[in-house]
Amino acid sequence: MSSRRSSRGSISEEEINELISKLQSLLPNSRRRGSSQASTTKLLKETCNYIKSLHREVDDLSDRLSDLMATMDHNSPGAEIIRSILRS
């Protein structure tokens, strides 16, 4: 698709609709709505809110992991498992 865009310099309405549909399918709440299509503005707002919630969740998990690592013996099997997961 990017090669089609670069040769024309613009994106078609059909391509935009396809991208919006793909975006909608990635949002957890959008799946529950079934086939009803949300407005593009609402969908973009939901996407931004979802991304923000994912950032908060990552931050929370990072804090929890830091707290856990601070209380563990750094030579324990649990600490080694966590380190190996973080390396992968």
UniProtKB/Swiss-Prot annotation:
Distribution of this protein across tissues and organs: Expressed in seedlings, lamina joints, nodes, roots, and floral organs including anthers, young panicles, pistil, lemma and palea. Expressed at low levels in leaves. Preferentially present in leaves lamina joints.
InterPro entries hit by this protein: bHLH_dom (IPR011598), HLH_DNA-bd_sf (IPR036638), PRE (IPR044293)
Transcription in keyword set: yes
Biological processes, Gene Ontology terms: brassinosteroid mediated signaling pathway; positive regulation of unidimensional cell growth; regulation of brassinosteroid mediated signaling pathway; regulation of DNA-templated transcription; regulation of leaf development; regulation of seed growth; response to absence of light; response to brassinosteroid
SUPFAM superfamilies assigned: HLH, helix-loop-helix DNA-binding domain
Coiled coil: none
A molecular function (GO) term: protein homodimerization activity
All copies of domain bHLH, residue ranges: 1-54
Function comment: Atypical and probable non DNA-binding bHLH transcription factor that acts as a positive regulator of grain size. Involved in the brassinosteroid (BR) signaling pathway. Binds the transcription repressor APG and forms a heterodimer of antagonistic basic helix-loop-helix transcription factors that regulates grain length and weight by controlling cell elongation in lemma and palea. Contributes, together with LO9-177 and BC1, to the promotion of leaf inclination and grain size by modulating cell elongation.
Nucleotide-binding in keyword set: no
The species this protein was found in: Oryza sativa subsp. japonica (Rice)
Subunit-structure text: Homodimer. Interacts with APG. Component of a nuclear cell elongation controlling complex made of ILI5/BUL1, LO9-177 and BC1. Binds directly to LO9-177, and interacts with BC1 only in the presence of LO9-177.
Signal peptide: none
GO terms for cellular component: cytoplasm; nucleus
Subcellular location as annotated: Nucleus; Cytoplasm
Effect of disrupting the coding gene: Erected leaves with reduced lamina angles associated with lower cells length, reduced internode length and small spikelets and grains. Impaired response to brassinolide (BL).
Protein name (record): Transcription factor ILI5
Induction, per UniProt: By brassinolide (BL). Accumulates in the dark.
Extra remark: Plants over-expressing ILI5 produce increased grain size, caused by elongated cells in lemma.
Domain of life assignment: Eukaryota
